[in-house]
Amino acid sequence: MEVLYSLSKTLKDARDKIVEGTLYSNVSDLIQQFNQMIVTMNGNDFQTGGIGNLPIRNWTFDFGLLGTTLLNLDANYVENARTTIEYFIDFIDNVCMDEMAREAQRNGVAPQSEALGKLAGIKFKRINFDNSSEYIENWNLQNRRQRTGFVFHKPNIFPYSASFTLNRSQPMHDNLMGTMWLNAGSEIQVAGFDYSCAINAPANIQQFEHIVQLRRALTTATITLLPDAERFSFPRVINSADGATTWFFNPVILRPNNVEVEFLLNGQIINTYQARFGTIIARNFDTIRSLFQLMRPPNMTPAVNALFPQAQPFQHHATVGLTLRIESAVCESVLADANETLLANVTAVRQEYAIPVGPVFPPGMNWTELITNYSPSREDNLQRVFTVASIRSMLIK
C-alpha cells in the first residue's frame, strides 16, 4: 500500500510540475525520484482486472529515464515525460479499481488483487518516498492490529432507523402518546407527543426517553444539540404498527422541559448535559441516552387553550423534540464520512463494472446494512478499499 501511495504521489507531482518552461533545477529532485521509480518498475509485468466486467489488462514496464538539462524543460522533454506519466497513471487507476472490487473474509486489510500483492514485494520497497498520508498511517496501524484514529467531520455512525413507540394507544388511534424518531448518518431527531397534552399525567408532565447504541465508540466529539425536531413538526399520516390501519399526527410544537443527554461508555456515564443547548462536547461514548419532558402549559391564552381541550376529540397533538447532530468526532474504526467521497468512489466502481456480491460487503454497498452488522471482517476490508480510494483520488478526479 505504501508503494502504491508513493507511486501516486510521485506521478501527481510529476504531472503538475514537469511542464514546459520549468527550470530543471526546480524539479531535479522530483526527476531523480521519478527515475528511481522507473528503474524499479522496469522489467516487471502485471495483470489487473478479471472480476465482474473489469477487463483483464496486462502491463509491461520498459521506459527510458528522464535526462538532465542545464536550462528549462522544452516541449520534447515534457512530451517524453508525459508518455511515461500517462501510462503509469493508467496502471495505478486499474490497480486501484481491481483492489476496490475485491474482498476477503480473512485478513481483508491485506492486498487482495494480484497486482497490489506483487507491488508489496521486497523488490519494490525502494519506491517509498512519502508515507505522510493519514489513511496510509492508519492502514499500517490496522494491518499491525494496533490502535487507529480517524478524524471525521461528520461520521456516518447511525444506521437509518425511522419508527415510533406508543406508550398509550387505542383501536381508534385518537388519543395516542409516545415517541417517534429518525436516526441516520450523524444525526438523531426524536419527538415525544401526547394527544391530550399531558392532561392526565402526574403533575401534567409526560416523560420521554430515547436510547441509541453506536456500532463503534467515538471520542472527542463536537455535537450540536437543539430543543426541536423539525422533521416531526408537520402533519402526517402514519401506518399503524400492525399495518392494519393508519393514524393522523397533527403536531403543535412545545419546548421540551428538563432535557438531559447522557453519553455512556460500556454502561458508565461519561458526560451528562442538562438543559444545555448549542455546542456540547462528549469525551468518549458508545451510547447516547436522551431524556426530556412534555409539560402541559399551566397558563394559556384562549387561543392556546383551544388547541389543547380537556377532553376528546384532540385535533392538535402536543409535541416536543430534540435534534442531536455529531459535527465531528474521532473513531478508532473506519467509517463513511459525509464530507468525503471514498464510499461513493468505491461503490461507483463496483457498480460500473458489475462486481458480483462477495462474502463481506452487502449488495450495492448498502451503508445502513453494512454499519448495522459492522463485523471485524467488514472493518478490515473497508480500511483497505477506502485507503485505495484515497490514493486513486489523487490522480483520478
Swiss-Prot record:
Post-translational modification: The N-terminus is blocked.
Compartment(s) of residence: Virion
Single annotated GO MF: host cell surface receptor binding
Annotated Zn(2+) binding sites: 153
Residue numbers spanned by region Interaction with the inner capsid protein VP2: 62-73
Binding residue positions for Ca(2+): 266, 286
Subunit structure of this chain's protein: Homotrimer. Interacts with the inner capsid protein VP2. Interacts with the outer capsid glycoprotein VP7. Interacts with the outer capsid protein VP5*.
Function of the protein: Intermediate capsid protein that self assembles to form an icosahedral capsid with a T=13 symmetry, which consists of 230 trimers of VP6, with channels at each of its five-fold vertices. This capsid constitutes the middle concentric layer of the viral mature particle. The innermost VP2 capsid and the intermediate VP6 capsid remain intact following cell entry to protect the dsRNA from degradation and to prevent unfavorable antiviral responses in the host cell during all the replication cycle of the virus.
Miscellaneous section: The VP6 trimer contains a zinc ion located at the center of the molecule. The zinc ion is not essential for either trimerization or transcription activity of the DLP. Zinc-depleted VP6 has an increased sensitivity to proteases.
Protein name as catalogued: Intermediate capsid protein VP6
Organism: Rotavirus A (strain RVA/Human/Japan/KU/1995/G1P1A[8])
